[in-house]
Amino acid sequence: MNKRKIELIIAFLIIIIVTISLFIIFKKDSQDFVYKGEKGEYKFDIQQIGTVTFYRPHVFVGGKEYIYAFRNKPQNLEELPLESGILNKLNRQGGLKELYITKDVNLSSQIEGNVNIVTAPMASILGKTDFGIYRIRVNSAYTSFHAGEPVAPTVDCSTVNYNGKVNKTVGVVYLKLGNDNKIYSEGDCIIIEGKDSDGLIKAGEKFAYHLIGVF
């Protein structure tokens, strides 16, 4: 094979590599989108892990970028009811010190073990990890005594609504199954309700989107 043919083959391979690279970049960019939310525009990128698609909003707070992962894009949650001003239920005069995300003992079995999928976005945003914006101590709890592992406290809406008075340092988010997919409150207790596993995940993510200002 002469030198000219080798040069042509190399040039052809370079063209193929560049074309494939541009296609991959274009495909990725074409999947990104900007969503006009309640508090501004949010850039989203899309990530595929196995069979699961994640929608990842980019949030900037105090000059720092936070990226979260959701299973539902905001366009698909717009009609899900969210009580107006519900974040006020987490306001405390001296600052909220602790938040319990509580659920009935049998909830995990009722929603196919997907409790962590429901809570992951909101816990990441609220918590004290590097991903947390609110920097609140977030704990898992049950509404009645739970003898299994790990040991968890017993917390329900009465924990925050005690004799008509609001607990001055603690907040409660109660996950439950019900007749609708929605986010509402009873007193100062925030309730995230879903008709089934999928509905509860959607309601949980709608609340998490609300925490970062998308809704």
Model-predicted regions and their roles:
Residues 32-35, 42-215:
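Long, low-hydrophobicity ectodomains and other hydrophilic envelope-associated domains
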Residues 1-31:
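Secretory targeting signatures
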